[in-house]
Design a protein with these regions (language model features):
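Bacterial N-terminal signal peptides that target proteins for export
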Residues: 1-11
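Conserved structured core elements
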Residues: 9, 16, 309-312
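Bacterial Sec-dependent N-terminal signal peptides
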Residues: 12, 16-39
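Generic structural detector for well-ordered beta-strands
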Residues: 18, 221-223, 312-314
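Beta-strand-rich ligand-recognition modules
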Residues: 33-53, 60-79, 83, 87-88, ...
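Extended extracellular/luminal ectodomain segments enriched in beta-structured repeat modules
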Residues: 87-96, 224-232, 243
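Flexible, low-complexity coil/linker segments
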Residues: 162-231, 354-408
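A short secondary-structure junction signal
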Residues: 212, 217-218, 241-249
Length: 591
């Protein structure tokens, strides 16, 4: 029956026959050795913006295309609607959202944009700021295969990009978006899609909820089907307003003397079910293209600035509980929010294809309310109010949640184990402020039944370094190093089934020695490798607002690395393509 049954070898993860089943290829031993290759469409010497992020690999076949909207201008603060009708018969091997944006040359701030359908968020991103002479354009993609059930009916969608367009802010944003449905074929099996997709937004127009403090929540009360076997909540917590630069914040008693925000420099997204702690997600320190110093991001934006990626919280231990026939309230909050975070969520629910009812429940849960972050204040202030010394903020937690579900696969024990550590150290002198921050998270989901177990392990690291200095002439220099590293590993008791590493690093510098011209530079390096033979490495560089280099590295075969990548994978680091972890495996050992 169902779109939610996946046997990894059969569904083109190609664990035993990578190249044949996934459309990859191998080079002949007589081939010319690969070389660094200039990136097509990225001209050195250009003032255009550029990103090294990969596009999504595609399955074979011609997609059926549904245009959501085209060349739509944005002005004002109202969502614009579009009509969606299912025009592409399924099943689908892959579904991709493509969106293209531009802002005319002129003056305009960075803005946030959302695309939603039936209240479900499909894309969240922010815009590239223009300049007087440069009209930026950019292209973003998201793998929406897991959303397939959402696209089965006619419904209304919305897009918003709140902005002011007038004589002062005259940069005009516009955009287009479309869905590409790739057909199933002999070489492209049906992709994994959830049976139910639930929105966590502020309403039918798919806008986020603004959470002002730790007590603010985004909640949905849902009557779930009686046969839930897996549940995953994708969360985006986007810092705004007073919280935009939350990593520069300080305890409330130091906020005024340091002229910064309060509530400490620690934030955390928390998930509960019926007021019981159910999961935790780190908050990524996104920096938008008008943030800190817009000159840092004029050519190369910060990590994920144009395409914010959600963090997945595995709620599968609660599958038995959610199947009990009672409504359940799932809530999202942000610890230490201080006006405010824009929060969105999407809940993916997979059901048993053979039973209309399953049962089970939670057997252990050590997740509790967090302790306050530890603050180490080594600051002193001179008579002029200048701070010197260090201010450290740390937090850490470990927890385990286990549940059982009795399904058509027998009794499974699902255990989520997570450890998280956070450190933020701010160093002050009379002429500088330096911030060194890192968040590290390790999450392992283990699905076990007698004689077999499957584990998905995900580790994420979010290093951030910022340095602000002022020279003797009062000129400011700002440097930034921002990175996200994600490692995914899927294994059973026979060994590793799939492993992948994604690393996205942006380094930027801006110095304004007035009246001399500003000196600005930036680099981005994006790499992705996996156990199926994927290899992607793109490097960009810019100097003084001009692109100086854009190469696909020889170590990954130069140009064409996306085309050689197995189409199933997500080089942006997502795991949705793996489907309902554990439930998709034949525990007899045959699949």
């Amino acid at each position: 029956m169902s779109t939610n049954r996946l046997t990894l070898p059969a569904l083109s993860l190609c664990l035993t026959s990578i190249l044949a089943a996934c459309g990859g290829g191998s080079s002949s031993s007589n081939s010319v050795p690969p070389q660094d290759t200039p990136v097509a469409g990225m001209a050195t010497g250009s003032g255009a913006n550029a990103v090294a992020d990969p596009t999504l690999p595609r399955p074979p076949g011609t997609p059926c295309v549904v245009q959501l909207y085209q060349n739509l201008n944005f002005s004002g603060f109202s969502s614009q609607s579009f009509s969606y009708q299912p025009a592409c018969s399924g099943p689908y091997s892959k579904i991709v959202l493509e969106a293209d944006y531009t802002v005319t040359a002129g003056r305009q701030f960075d803005r946030t944009t959302h695309i939603s359908l039936g209240g479900v968020n499909l894309l969240t991103g922010t815009t590239q700021e223009p300049s007087r002479s440069v009209a930026p354009t950019w292209h973003v993609e998201r793998d929406l295969t897991e959303y397939a059930s959402l696209f089965a009916k006619t419904q209304t969608g919305y897009v918003d990009l709140d902005t002011i367009v007038d004589g002062t802010y005259n940069g005009q944003p516009s955009g287009s978006a479309r869905l590409l449905f790739y057909p199933v074929s002999a070489s492209a099996a049906a992709g994994n899609s959830a049976n139910y997709v639930y929105p966590f937004t502020s309403g039918a127009n798919g806008r986020p909820a603004n959470l002002n403090n730790s007590s603010s929540v985004l909640s949905q009360t849902i009557s779930f089907p009686g046969n839930v076997v897996r549940a995953y909540l994708d969360v985006i917590a986007q810092s705004q307003s007073n919280d935009e630069f939350w990593y520069t914040c300080a305890p409330d008693n130091l906020a005024t003397p340091l002229q910064t925000c309060g509530s400490t420099a620690f934030r955390e997204t928390q998930v509960s079910i019926d007021s019981v702690p159910a999961g935790v997600a780190p908050v990524y320190p996104w920096i938008y293209t008008g943030g800190m110093d817009p000159g840092l991001w004029r050519n190369i934006p910060a990590v994920q600035a144009l395409n914010l990626q959600p963090y997945r919280v595995d709620l599968s231990p609660f599958a038995g509980k959610l199947s009990d026939g009672q409504p359940h309230t799932v809530s999202i909050s942000v610890l230490n929010a201080n006006s405010y975070f824009s929060v969105l969520g999407t809940l993916f629910v997979y059901t048993d294809p053979y039973r209309s009812n399953v049962n089970g429940g939670i057997i252990a849960n050590t997740l509790t309310a967090p302790a306050a972050p530890v603050v180490n204040n080594q600051l002193s202030f001179d008579s002029s109010g200048n701070a010197s010394g260090t201010l450290g903020t740390t937090s850490g937690r470990q927890f385990q949640i286990s549940g059982i579900v009795n399904s058509s696969r027998g009794q499974e024990t699902i255990t989520v184990t997570q450890s998280m550590s956070f450190s933020n150290v701010q160093t002050f002198t009379a002429t500088s402020q330096n911030i060194v921050q890192n968040t590290s998270v390790r999450t392992a989901t283990q699905i076990a039944k007698p004689g077999r177990q499957v584990t998905l392990e995900r580790t994420s690291s979010y290093p951030l370094q910022l340095n602000f200095t002022v020279d003797s002439n009062g000129n400011w220099k700002t440097t930034s190093s921002q990175e996200i590293v994600v490692k995914n590993k899927l294994a059973d008791d026979r060994g590793t089934l799939f492993a992948a590493t994604m690393d996205n690093l942006v380094n930027s510098s801006s110095y304004a020695p007035a009246p001399a011209p500003s000196v600005r530079s930036a680099t981005q390096t994006f790499s992705y490798t996996d156990s199926l033979g994927s290899c992607y490495l793109r490097k960009l560089g810019s100097q003084n607002l001009l692109l100086t280099s854009a190469i696909d590295a020889a170590s990954c075969g130069g140009a064409g690395s996306i085309a050689r990548m197995p189409w199933k994978v997500d080089p942006q680091g997502g795991t949705g393509f793996l489907g309902p972890i554990g439930f998709s495996f034949d525990f007899s050992g045959n699949g």
